[in-house]
Amino acid sequence: FWASLEPQNRSLNDTEFVLAGNSESLQVLTENAPAPAFYIFNCVEKGGFVIVSGEDTAQPILAYSTTDTFAIDNMPDNIRNWLQAYRTAIQQLRLVDVPLDENTVNLWKSPERTLTQANNSKLIETAKWNQEEPYNLYSPKIVGRRTPTGCVATAMAIIMRYRQWPDIGEGSNRYYANTCEKYLETSFDVNYDWEGMPLEYIEGKYTKEEADKVSMLMYHCGIAAEMDYGLEGSGAVTRTAILNMIKYFKYDKSAYILQRDWYDQETWDNLIRNEVTNESPVMYGGADPDGAHQFIIDGYEGSHFHVNWGWGGLCNGFYLLSALTPEQQGVGGNGSYNQLQDAVMGLKKREENSTYHDILIFFAGLDNGKKYNGLSTNTSTYVTGKTFRMDAAYIGNSSLRDFEGSLVLALVNKNGEVKENISKTILLEETLPLGMGIGYPNIECKITQAIEAGDRIWMMYKSKDASEWYRIVGEKGTVTEIIVKEDDPTAIEQPVDRISFSASCDKQGWLTANLPEGVQRLCIYSVDGRTLRTYIPDSNIEKWGVSCSELPAGIYILQAVTKQENYQCKFVK
């Protein structure tokens, strides 16, 4: 497709330069603009596009397509947000002056290899649907204009069209839509004619009946997700959407939501790749201070993933989930690139005797001035038969329901296979509500088996109605495993603490935070990504506080936005 990316070949006659990512608003390059983070080229003659990094320490090919073109006019927010994430990641590389590594050098020597990964590829055909006419014929009107369907409803509908499920919905829903200033409701007890909904609606080539069927589906998805409709965009919460796909559309309750921030790049890519390999498109989301975005990942080629943006095929193509190599993921702290990205796994037709797939995670927090950061222990030397003690805090519930079940500390080998439990099983005395956290200090532990190279300690959990134990993972910066005996020094997990940024909330609801340098804006999010509050703090202050007494009890995310990057931490109210 693209034979070469050498500078002298970047203005070939059959390509069109359409955008340089050099500014906050992603404007077209001007003579006095700083070095762009990336360049976008369309292939005019045959179709397709390529996004090339403007930084040689980043991966060369950020995104490409051999069919669809990249249009910058009226660019949807989810695409703009993704490009901004590329730009932020590349800026972080430049700020810390990262040297070239061998892997990146080799990628730049032969970037065309990115486009020829046929032995490691998968593509699922999903609907090229949009948010406007004919998809929004049932959407509510505001000042006489139809609102868009919303990216969450569109992603839901694309998944449902692929599954061709449900046959008939169940029940009804009614809620108050703030932007519409009225109650919206509908019954889902209707037949969905999947064959009567084309995978692509081309102007002049679909019937009124086909338009009516898809717009009804979109509206039902919006009502199920409790969409907040607006003329400039409609929004909904992913967790609400998934819970109500289970409730109203007969999807399996084993579906679950994972956050990008809990995993390293290789593990995350493999999770998404395995889902697609198993013929399951992924609802993928991300958020920034301006809102949340949802789209579909329905394929991969090598390390690139095929994105259906839900805008009628606009800008669909293969995208890197990170502009950075795995070795560069720690550059600049957590940054905003992976911020609040999530993926919905296991969306499938309801199965008998299935159970919920609960998710527990570690997050950092303060309690009476003491910082808890996942797992910690009172020893650095482990001897078979000798007792030691561990702390485990905070453990947060990120499931689709309140958690009931058990916890235990386990010794596992270097392959992640459990050798033995080293603590008593902790049975939660009370239900752990969704969005709440709990801690367990001073847990007595003893290893009885022979200690081998690569052994480590994990905390495991099991739901009350499940048979399997799962590992508790955690946000970047938390300690999710304790190395008992080293095997490979590079395998030791170290907490990321590049800046002094922490927050705690007292019993009266007063939030106190230690801020990084140069904070321009502070945002409080719910755990599902909704922006609850935004503040502009005084410049150059190190400690900041505000009352959160009116917020309900739960886990919240505090985001600090600086000129260079964004930081986040969680706090419990």
Residue ranges of model-derived segments:
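C-terminal outer-membrane/trafficking sorting elements
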Residues: 493-573
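Active-site-adjacent substructure of cysteine-protease-like catalytic cores
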Residues: 15-18, 23-47, 243, 247-308, ...
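Surface-exposed, short loops/turns at beta-strand junctions within beta-sandwich domains
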Residues: 446-454, 548-553
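Residue-level detector of functionally pivotal "anchor" positions at catalytic/ligand-binding pockets or at interdomain
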Residues: 341-367, 485-512
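Short beta-strand elements
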Residues: 465-489, 571-573
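Aromatic sugar-binding surface patches on proteins
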Residues: 428-445, 540-545
